[in-house]
């Protein structure tokens, strides 16, 4: 196993522990708590994949961080912070909408890269909107936290979420996954639109009908993919 992979996991475990202590003091806002919860799932998945104990890794990560901080000057820290571009966290969904449990009458699931696409194919003839919480850097989608499909009545009928065991995805991965979800929902004569925020930062454009600029050929392909593979 690569040593950098192990040490990276150890540092991530310790930094998560620090963030958890911060949250335990009721100091974290909603985006902070949301990332904390999802990063916990990711660490568990990575720990299982690597065969490493999280508690032991956290202790090792603490030693690594302490060594770095001991060698770090205040001036170097200021320069590092100034050189790192800041990302923004954007929310279409409330914390309640993100954490709400939902159930499917006809569950369908597809894994696309490091993203998991789930939908209820029993849903027909509904108006559906896709909402997402995600981070943005340089005015482009950086990391998808969670995307969910809602009916006008507020019911959740679909979802795209990162797989904890396979961290890392691009904005193209997200756009492809959205295309798959739209194709599957439209197969049952649902009308699907995407939130303006997601359109703006994933596609850098928006349409009046709420549709991302997916070519007709791609949309037909997405629908066939959902029907045959999901």
Swiss-Prot record:
Its main location: host cell. The keyword rRNA processing does not apply. It is found in: Host nucleus; Host cytoplasm. Residues 205-230 are annotated as: Disordered. Residues 1-73 are annotated as: RNA-binding and homodimerization. InterPro entries: NS1, NS1A, NS1A_effect_dom-like_sf, uS15_NS1_RNA-bd_sf. GO terms for molecular function: protein serine/threonine kinase inhibitor activity; RNA binding. A motif (Nuclear export signal) lies at residues 137-146. Upon interferon induction, ISGylated via host HERC5; this results in the impairment of NS1 interaction with RNA targets due to its inability to form homodimers and to interact with host EIF2AK2/PKR. GO terms for cellular component: host cell cytoplasm; host cell nucleus. Residues 180-215 are annotated as: CPSF4-binding. Keywords: Eukaryotic host gene expression shutoff by virus, Host cytoplasm, Host gene expression shutoff by virus, Host mRNA suppression by virus, Host nucleus, Host-virus interaction, Inhibition of host innate immune response by virus, Inhibition of host interferon signaling pathway by virus, Inhibition of host PKR by virus, Inhibition of host pre-mRNA processing by virus, Inhibition of host RIG-I by virus, Inhibition of host RLR pathway by virus, Interferon antiviral system evasion, RNA-binding, Ubl conjugation, Viral immunoevasion. It comes from the Viruses. Residues 223-230 are annotated as: PABPN1-binding. A motif (Nuclear localization signal) lies at residues 34-38. GO terms for biological process: symbiont-mediated suppression of host cytoplasmic pattern recognition receptor signaling pathway via inhibition of RIG-I activity; symbiont-mediated suppression of host gene expression; symbiont-mediated suppression of host mRNA processing; symbiont-mediated suppression of host PKR/eIFalpha signaling; symbiont-mediated suppression of host type I interferon-mediated signaling pathway. Homodimer. Interacts with host TRIM25 (via coiled coil); this interaction specifically inhibits TRIM25 multimerization and TRIM25-mediated RIGI CARD ubiquitination. Interacts with human EIF2AK2/PKR, CPSF4, IVNS1ABP and PABPN1. Belongs to the influenza A viruses NS1 family. The dsRNA-binding region is required for suppression of RNA silencing. Inhibits post-transcriptional processing of cellular pre-mRNA, by binding and inhibiting two cellular proteins that are required for the 3'-end processing of cellular pre-mRNAs: the 30 kDa cleavage and polyadenylation specificity factor/CPSF4 and the poly(A)-binding protein 2/PABPN1. In turn, unprocessed 3' end pre-mRNAs accumulate in the host nucleus and are no longer exported to the cytoplasm. Cellular protein synthesis is thereby shut off very early after virus infection. South Carolina isolate has been sequenced from formalid fixed-lung tissues of a 21-year-old male which died in 1918 at Ft. Jackson, SC. Brevig Mission isolate has been sequenced from lung tissues of an Inuit woman buried in the permafrost in a gravesite near Brevig Mission, Alaska. This sample was recovered by John Hultin, retired pathologist. This is Non-structural protein 1. The gene is NS.
């Amino acid at each position: 196993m690569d040593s950098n992979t192990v040490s990276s996991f150890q540092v991530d475990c310790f930094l998560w522990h620090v963030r958890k202590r911060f949250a335990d003091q009721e100091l974290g806002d909603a985006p902070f708590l949301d990332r904390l919860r999802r990063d916990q799932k990711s660490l568990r998945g990575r720990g299982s994949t690597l065969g490493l104990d999280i508690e032991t890794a956290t202790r090792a990560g603490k030693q690594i961080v302490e060594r770095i901080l001991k060698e770090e000057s205040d001036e170097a820290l200021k320069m590092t912070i100034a050189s790192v571009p800041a990302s923004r966290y954007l929310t279409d969904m409330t914390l309640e909408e993100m954490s709400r449990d939902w159930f499917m009458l006809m569950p369908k699931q597809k894994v696309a890269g490091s993203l998991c696409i789930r939908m209820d194919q029993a849903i027909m003839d509904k108006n559906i909107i896709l909402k997402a919480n995600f981070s943005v850097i340089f005015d482009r989608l950086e990391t998808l936290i969670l995307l969910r499909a809602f009916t006008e009545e507020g019911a959740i009928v679909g979802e795209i979420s990162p797989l904890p065991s396979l961290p890392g995805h691009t904005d193209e991965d997200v756009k492809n996954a959205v295309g798959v979800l739209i194709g599957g929902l439209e197969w049952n004569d649902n009308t699907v639109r995407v939130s303006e925020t997601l359109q703006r930062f994933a596609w850098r454009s928006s349409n009046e009908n709420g549709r991302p600029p997916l070519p007709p050929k791609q949309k037909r392909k997405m629908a066939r993919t959902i029907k045959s593979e999901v």
